[in-house]
Amino acid sequence: VALDDEFEFDSYEVHHQANDTIDAGGNNKKDAKPEQSSIQSNLSKGKDKDVNVGTSGTHTVPRIKAITSKMRMPRSKGVAALNLEHLLEYAPQQIDISNTRATQSQFDTWYEAVRMAYDIGQTEMPTVMNGLMVWCIENGTSPNINGVWVMMDGNEQVEYPLKPIVENAKPTLRQIMAHFSDVAEAYIEMRNKKEPYMPRYGLIRNLRDISLARYAFDFYEVTSRTPVRAREAHIQMKAAALKSAQPRLFGLDGGISTQEENTERHTTEDVSPSMHTLLGGKNM
C-alpha cells in the first residue's frame, strides 16, 4: 500500500533526448515545397510544342488571304483608296445598311413625332405600336391610306388618326414599318399555333399555302436567311399587288391659263362660235 501511495502522490518529470521542437504538420509542408518545385520543373521541361496540323515534316502549307494587296484596287494619286485590314473585318448586318429600311435616326424621329401628335406617354406608346403593327399586317402600308386606323380594346374599337403616322414617315411608311418585320413574322406564327390565320395581304393574292402566311405582309424584309420558296411567293404577291397600280409622275396641272389673248369677235349671225358668217350660208 505504501508503494502505491508513493506512485500516486509523487510527481515525475519526463525529458526528451533531443532539443528539437517537433511539429506534426511542419515538416510535411517544408518537404512538400521542394517536391512541388521539382514537379513543376519536370512539367516545364517535358512540355512539348503544339502540333501544327498544317505541317507535314519540315514543309509548311501556305495560307492565302481572301483579299490581298496584289489585286487591282481603286487608287487616288497612286495610293490605294481602300483599307484592306478594315475591309477584312467589316461585315455589317444587311438590314442595317439596306435602303429598304429607314435609318435608326429616321425611325426615332417618326416615333417621337407620332407620340407627340397622339399626346401619350412613353409607357403607353409601345401598346399603341402593337396595335399599329397588327393593323398594318392586315391593311398594308400604302402611302395612299387615309382616315383612321383601329385598335381593339376587348370588344371596343379605339380609333387613331392616320395623318401623323403617314405624314411623319420618312422616307416612306413601308420603310418605317420594316423595323417591325421580324416581330410581325413571329406574331403571325404565334397566331397560327392557335388557329389558322392568313393576313389579308395573302388572302387577296389567293395564297393557298398556310405555311407561307408568315411572309404574307407587304413590309416583310427579304434577307439572305429567307427560304427560296418563301422569297418567290413574297415577290409574286408584290408583283400582283403592283400590276394594277399606275403611278403618275405628274398630275393634272391646276395652274392652267391661256397662252395668248383671243381677239376674235363673233355675232349671232355667225355660223358657229368658232366660224364667222358665210354671207347667208347656213350650217347644215
Curated annotation (Swiss-Prot):
Enzyme class: transferase
Ranges of biased composition (kind: Polar residues): 35-44
A Pfam cross-reference name: Poty_coat
Catalytic reaction annotation: RNA(n) + a ribonucleoside 5'-triphosphate = RNA(n+1) + diphosphate
Ranges annotated as spanning the membrane: none
Keyword Metal-binding among UniProt keywords: no
Chain positions covered by the region annotation Disordered: 16-57, 255-284
GO MF, one annotated term: RNA-directed RNA polymerase activity
Domain of life: Viruses
CC annotations in GO: viral capsid
Annotated site location: Cleavage: Q17, A18
PTM annotation: Genome polyprotein of potyviruses undergoes post-translational proteolytic processing by the main proteinase NIa-pro resulting in the production of at least ten individual proteins. The P1 proteinase and the HC-pro cleave only their respective C-termini autocatalytically. 6K1 is essential for proper proteolytic separation of P3 from CI.
UniProt protein name: Genome polyprotein
